[in-house]
Amino acid sequence: MTQLASSYDPSSFESRLYAQWESAGHFKPSGSGEPYTVLLPPPNVTGTLHMGHAFQQTLMDALVRYHRMRGYDTLWQVGTDHAGIATEMVVSRNLALEGKGETRDTLGREGFIAKVWEWKAQSGDTIERQMRRLGTSSDWSRSTFTMDPQPSAAVTEAFVRWYEQGLIYRGQRLVNWDPVLKTAISDLEVENVEEDGFLWSIRYPLADGVTYEHVEHDADGVETLRETRDYLVVATTRPETMLGDTAVMVHPDDARYATLHAAQIVLPLTGRLVPVITDDYVDRAFGTGVVKVTPAHDFNDYQVGVRHDLPLINLFTVTAAINDNAPERYRGLDRYDARKLVLSELEDLGLLVETKPHKLQVPRGDRTGQVIEPYLTDQWFVKMDALAKRGLELVESGQVKFVPPNWINTYRHWMENIQDWCISRQLWWGHRIPAWFDEAGKCYVGHDEAQVRATHGLGAEVALHQDSDVLETWFSSQLWPFSTLGWPDAQAMDERGFARYLPSSVLVTGFDIIFFWVARMIMATDSFTGQVPFRDVYITGLIRDAQGQKMSKSKGNVLDPLDIIDGISIEDLVAKRTSGLMQPRMAEKIEKATRKEFPDGIIAHGADALRFTIAALATHGRDIKFDLGRAEGYKNFCNKLWNATRFALMNTEGAQFSGVPQPQTETERWILARLDAVAAEAQAHYANYRFDLLAQTLYEFAWNAFCDWFVELAKPALNGAVQDAADSTRHTLLYVLEALLRLLHPLTPFVTEELWQQVAPRLGITGDTISLQAFPQRGDVDTSGYAGAEADIEWLKAMVSALRRVRSELNVPPSKQVRLWLQAGSSDDRARVARFASQLAFLLKLEAIDWLAAGQEAPPAAAAIVGELTLLVPLEGLVDMDAERTRLDKEIKRVENEIGKCNGKLGNATFVQNAPAAVVEQERARLNDWTTQLTGLREQRAKL
C-alpha cells in the first residue's frame, strides 16, 4: 500500500477512487437485506449540474451511502428527462451556429428529430459525468432516459388506459401560450416579473340610450360629483384585448350600478353589443368597480365566461398577431402594434379617459423571455378531480409522509383547487400523442396505428394521420417511480425488481415542484399500480446566494458546483458568467461584481468540502443561503482529518490490533463513550432528515473531541513509560479514527475512503472499500461504566483550557515551564489533580503543581477558576503587573456578561415556566458557577 501523502490534495485521489468504486460495482443493489430505494428527479438531458442539483444529490447520496453501510439493499435510480422545449431550443440554436442554413422547419419533423438524437448521443451524458465528480453512488447501469423504448412504452400505455377510463379528453381551453415557441407551456415555465406599465381608463358606451346616476365621494364620505352618465369606465392594462370582450361585469351588491344589470354595452371600435353581468368576483373597491371580461385571453375571465356561458373570442394567431376575429384594420398586426392603434383610435373618439403608470406582474416564458398569452386552443387534458381526491387521501392518511410536515398544507391547497391538466405540447421532440384522426376528424386512440385499425376495423383505404402534438414532459415524469422498474412489461418488471423496489423509500426534491411532479407521481402511481410511489417526501429549501438572492444567469451570481470542487480562474469565471446573457447590457455590471467578490477566482475545495457544506446548510427552512466561506472552512476540516490520520499512523507504525480496545486510561474511556453517543445521534439525525444537525454533530466530534482533545490528551500515554497504557491508547486511537471515518463517509466519501485504506489494515479489517463497512452503532463498544470517565475528562479539558487561556493572555512562550498553585477546590478536584498530574504537567508545561495551605497568602499570580478550584500562575519573572491587571479586568467582564445572560433567562417568566425543569435547574447551576468564578477573580484583582 502506498504511503499517505503529506498534505491533503483532493484532486490527487477523488477521480481515482470514484473509478474504482464504479468499476467494482459497489453502487449496484446487493439483492439482499431490506430494500432502500431513492429516486433521482431526472435532470434535463440538456442541462449541466447546478447548485440545486448538487444540493439535493448530496443529501440523496448521503442517505444511500448510509443505508448501504447499514446493510440495506440500496437502489438509487438515476436518469435524465428528454426536456422537450429545452432540447428543441438547444438543437435549433446549434443548427443556427453551424451556418448551413438548416432549421427546424427546413429539416421537417423526421429530419429534426434525427438531429436531436445526434445531439443527445454527443452531449446528452454531460450531467451524468458531472454527477460522478460530485461522488453520487448511483447504479449507472440502470440509468434511464425518458425517451428510451421501455419508458416510452409506459407513456403510451398510461395514455391509452386513462383515455379508455374517460380521464383523458380533447377540448378547447385556455392555456399558457409562448408565441415564440408556438406551444403551450406549464405554469412552472412561466415567470411573473414585476415591470413598469400603464393602466388605461376607457369609456364603454351604454346601448339603447340607457343612463344612470353617477355619484363620487371623497375619503370622508362627502359627495364631490353627481352626474348622469351614458357610459361605464373600465380600467385595463391590456387595451388590445378589448376587441375580444364579451361582457362587462359589476358586483351584484354594488348599488352604483344596480339599475344596469340588464343593460348592454356598445363595445368601442367593434360596434358589438355585450351584456352587463353581475359576479361576486368583482372587487367593488378597485377602480370604478367595473371590469371588462375577455374569456379567451384571461384565466380569471375564462372562469367567469364558463359560469355565465359567454362567447369565447380568440383574437390571436399562434405568433400573437391579430387574427380574423378582429375588425379588418387590425388583422395581421403584432399585439403591441395593435395596442397602439387601439389607444390612438380611442383617443380620437374621446373614449380614452386616463393613462397612468402602473406596476404590472408580467408573465414571461422562462426560456424565451417573451410575454406569455392566455390562449384558447384545442389541447389534450386529464380530468383531475377523482385523481386529486385519491392523491390527497394517500397523504392525509399517512401513507405518504412529508418532511417537514408543514408542506402537507401546500399540497392540500393545490389538490383542493386543482384544474384539469393540459398535457399536449405543440412540439416535435417528445412522446407523440397516440391518437389518429380520419378525414372526417374522428379520433382513435391506441398503442399504434396497426392496433387502431384492427380494433376499429379500419382498412387501408381509410386514411389516418397521427396527432402532431407531443405530451408534456411532466406526463412521462409522473411515471418515473414505476416506469424505471419495467412497467408495464411483466418480464422487465421482474428483471428490474418492480415488486421489491416499489414503493421507493424517499423522494428528495424542492417545494417548487410539489404540485407539478410530486403530486402527479402520487396520483399516477396509485392509479396504475395501486401503490404509493414513495414513503417519505423530504422537501428541501432552494439554494440562494450568500445575500439570499436567487441564483440566476441574469443576476450573474450563479455558482457552478464543479468550479467549487476543481477551482476556476477569475478570467474563466468572468467569461462563464457574462457569455450567453439574454440581456447583454448586464455583462459589464456582472463582470465588476464578480471581480470584486472573487478577485483571485475560486480555489479548488474538493467534492468532500462542498458536500459537507451542503449538509451543514440543509436546515428545514424555505431558503438556503450558500456561503463559499463555509466551503473553505470545511476544506480545512478535511485537512484537519487528514493530519490527524497522519498523526495516528506515525504513532502506530508497525502496530497491529484487532477487535474492540480494552481501555487502560480515562482518556480512552471518555472518547469511546463519546463515540458511542455520536453514533446514536447520527442515526437519529438521518432518521429525521436533519443533515444540518448531523454535520454539526460529526464536525464537533471530529474536530473538537477527537482531533483537538483526544489526540492531545493521548500524548502523555503514547509517550509514557507504561507500555500497557501506550498500547491501549494506540489501539483506541486507531479504533476511534476508523469509526469516525465510517461516520463521516456518507457525507465525505472521498477523503474517508483514502484515509480508511491506510487505517483499516492496522486494525485487521478486511474489505475493498469503506462504503461496504458497517455504519457505527450504539453499543459497538460497551460504555456502560464510562460515565465517570466522561466527567473526569470534561474536568481535565476545563483545566487545560483555563491554563492555556492564562498562558496565551500572558504571552508565555509555549516551551516555557510555569509553576501552578491550586487553591480551594472540592475533594473530587484534589483526587483528579492527583490522578491527572502527569497529563497536566505534560500538556501545560508545568514545572510543579502545589496546593496553597488554608490561610496561606497567595503570591501575585494570574488566576483562573474551574468550578470551585482556583488556579494561580505566579507572575514573578513572567509578566508585568499592568498586563495582568488588564487580563483580569477582561476576564471579570466576560464572566459578568455570562452572569447577565443567566439572570436574563432566569428573570424571564416564560422561560422559567415553560422550559423543562432540568433545563431551568441547569441554568441556575451555571449562574452559581459563574458567580463563584467572579468572586475569585475579583479577589485576585484586589491583590494587584
Swiss-Prot record:
- Motif 'KMSKS' region per UniProt: ranges: 550-554
Spell out the CDD domains in the cross-references: Anticodon_Ia_Val, ValRS_core
Q: Name one GO cellular component term.
A: cytosol
Predominant localisation class: cytoplasm
- Residues that bind ATP: 553
- A Gene Ontology molecular function term of the record: aminoacyl-tRNA deacylase activity
- Per its UniProt record, what InterPro entries does this chain match? aa-tRNA-synth_I_CS, aa-tRNA-synth_Ia, Anticodon_Ia_Val, M/V/L/I-tRNA-synth_anticd-bd, Rossmann-like_a/b/a_fold, tRNA-bd_arm, tRNAsynth_Ia_anticodon-bd, Val-tRNA_synth_C_sf
Q: Provide an example Pfam family for this protein.
A: tRNA-synt_1
Q: Where is motif 'HIGH' region found?
A: 43-53
Q: Does the keyword Ligase apply?
A: yes
Q: Name one GO biological process term.
A: valyl-tRNA aminoacylation
Q: What is its EC number?
A: 6.1.1.9
Q: Where in the cell is it found?
A: Cytoplasm
- Function field: Catalyzes the attachment of valine to tRNA(Val). As ValRS can inadvertently accommodate and process structurally similar amino acids such as threonine, to avoid such errors, it has a 'posttransfer' editing activity that hydrolyzes mischarged Thr-tRNA(Val) in a tRNA-dependent manner.
Give the family per the record. Belongs to the class-I aminoacyl-tRNA synthetase family. ValS type 1 subfamily.
Q: How does it assemble?
A: Monomer.
What HAMAP family does the entry give? Val_tRNA_synth_type1
Task: Let me see what the UniProt entry remarks about domains.
Answer: ValRS has two distinct active sites: one for aminoacylation and one for editing. The misactivated threonine is translocated from the active site to the editing site. The C-terminal coiled-coil domain is crucial for aminoacylation activity.
Write down what this protein is called.
Valine--tRNA ligase
